Amino acid sequence: MVVTHVSSDRDPWPSMRDETKTTRQFVRFGVASMRGCDSLLVQRWRPDQDSREPDLVDNDRFTFAGSFAVSGKNAAEKGSLVVSRFLFDLATATESSTITFTEYTNLLEGEFKNRLKTRAKPLAIAEALADQAFIALKLPPDLRPSVKCVVVSRSKPVKEGKKARKIRDARLFGNAYPGLLRQLRQDVEDCLVIGGAWDLLTQPSAESDFDAGCDDTVLERLETHRYPSARWPSDFSLSPYQQVAVNELFARTSREGIFSINGPPGTGKTTLVMDVVAEIISRRAEILLRFDNPLDAFKATASGSDHGSTFEIDSALHDFIIAVASSNNGAVNNLTLELPKRSKIGERYGKQLNYLPKLAERILAQHQVTSPAWGSVSVPLGNKQNRDRCASAVAELIDDGCPDDDDLSTRNWGEACAIYRAAKARVDDLKAKHVRLDELARSADEFGSLQKAAGARPPVVTASSARNGSLAMSQAEAMEAASHPIIAASQRQIEEAREELGKVVLPAEFLDADPRARAEMLVGTSTALEDARADLFVAAMALHQSFIAGAWDPISANLRAWTERIAHPETGGSPSSAVHLWSTFSLLVPVVSSTFCSFANVFASLGRDAIPWLIVDEAGQAAAHHAIDALSRAKRTIVIGDPFQLEPISAISSSVDDALASRFGIPREFRSKAGSLQTLADRINPFGARRNGKWIGAPLLVHRRCIEPMFSISNALAYEHSMVLVNNALQAENPVGNDRLAFGPESAWFNVRGASEMPDRFYVPEEGALACYIMSRLAECRPPQHRGQLPDLFVISPFRKVALGIREDLLANAPTMFGHTAPDVVEEWAERSIGTVHSFQGKEAEIVLLVLGASDAESISWALAKPNIMNVAVTRARRRLYVIGNRANWFQDSSRDAWMLGQGRDWLVDEADARALFSRSPHHKPHLRLVV
């Protein structure tokens, strides 16, 4: 993409055509300064406010009245005019004009058509349209800068033997959110149900002195009867805090509602989501059991689609569609492309799970995922390409015919039902045994048995007895109680239960353990029960497979109609029929994902309150007004994120935000720049805790991603030392001997005092040179099995100009740094591995180089004002963190910036010593040139 600002009458079109590419230009006309627009709003809404304050947007940011396309013959294209609402809404908000949007659009379209008839040049058309727009909207002329228009050129390579596809407008003005918000407001005025959006906007604050992470609460929420019947078939159970969150969210969203979970980096948010998905699927299996024959769940409808008849699916099966949404496209894609991987299930379940494998393999292959799949559990649908891909995969499945024995040794319906009932009975039986074990422990406690003084095993106690100190008995009383025949019988039964259940953690054992051990101790369950819950999910998937085979005719008919609907959402269709099609598709693929921006397109045919389960990932990054439409379509919403990681990016200035709040009386928590969807969902969740001055939803506290010092830096920066680092296998895997440079020397701050530091330059070339040197050494010193591969690392900076400078340095030195590695491979790796902190939310690497840059206090203060940016940067690293920068510039506040001092005397390393640390090898040491 090439952007040209046109300030004169000189023709901006390229003089020579590139035959290897097809190119199309779009002319953005009616250019207006965003700074001027901000000032106009502030003056209108809050005239007493100083609109010249420094946080107003930069001078070089513009908005536009609209755009049109220019053909290869340098003529405006008929029918290509797009009119933006921004300037119209600005005029409406400031009461500059009373013209309607329809009248305004018709005016510009008429002018455009008239100019086309006279064969006017594109620049003349742009000026005429701009004049008409500003006159019609009665906007002040000083909004118009010297730039007459902006020309955007977009190109695509021409592939040999294929017809060049027409380049479409990249929706320059296609922000869907204003239209969605207007429709939501209208629905509220019409008294329609708006799902979870109503709770988010109207419920009072639930903040209190309650602490969801305290021992009493954890033990209470881990009582056996609170556990879901099924879990994801992993070799490992959830941590107690994850399990508390899962138990509580199902208890609080039985029919509707919002539940928020606070997940710091590396605390297992994805793992938690997998358990939620497993339980929802297993709950649907309970409904499937009701049908003596799978065909009984379907009823033919009078009307159908262009592809034939459709069927109504029993309404009891409408409640299991799962949608995952986020502002972050990478987050939703990563989640829904991770769940189907065979690596995500435990080894003992590998041969038992093989759910619609052809469909699963097609879905992963469409997204260039080469990992083997266990089943078609999820798919990303968040843009048209993804929807077309999925529709194609489903169409191929229909063409293949009914899933047969080659797919999963499909059992007959009766056998599948019997196996599921047996698995469910096993779970129920083990839960009953746990309840009985708890009752026996209570009885033993009441009689004061199992005292150490009597020589028995350590006491079996409940949480209440441990807290109340009711075990203080004399030795004589203990011996007398232990000899009581009832208590002796209870002890025998307790021992028998332990032998059958396997590993069991009793409340007293949990309370007596140190925090690190406690973080992995699940109370209320056992090895046997965890295995049985996973087996139930396996049986549920087999039941679904058998159900699909038994009702393939109505299912395939509905799938044909679904593929038509999802590929062409503009064709509409009633919500009443859509829910039957979506519920049918959900039998095959239970989880779908989308960004908020595309959510309304994916679920265009479903109305408000129609999606049974919405899971929002990375909610701390999501602006509430972006998410509100998705919430309005959902019955239940699970909001997962972290207010101490990256915050939403807001294009609105603080001045306009303040003026807007003043004009319309907006409470602070609902203001655009005050928080995120996560903070609003946390606000109404009574099951939470206060951390770092903020009320958060159910906290996840067990960290498994990073080793030291990254864990302690993050824990101190953002979480008041509430997280616990456990089972750190990464530490044990550190290379030794000749392979010690595989991950590099210990984490450190490399103190670089750049001779070229300047207040107005963010990039310090000396810092970039050291970063490139380290990258080259890490690439050269990789273990033999990885020699020749580029290292698993990220180069991160708070500032875009620093990231661009490092990328430029690296590409200039690539032959010296990486030997014979192909330039396109290096370029792709650099694009993927070097960027700002905002590029890496949700990602991780073995090594992170945090290159700080900047020398002026104001920029540094911006990066450090909140813990969010540094918290995310530091926790991208699993094994090594190398901070590169001038610590004298960055250390500003002795309490806030204490992490910069490190935990050991070797943390601060001068630049020369840093190079020496990476040079202790007989290999060639490259000499890199600075790119200034």
Model-derived regions, located:
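Helicase C-terminal subdomain and adjacent C-terminal extension
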Residues: 372-373, 653-698, 821, 857-932
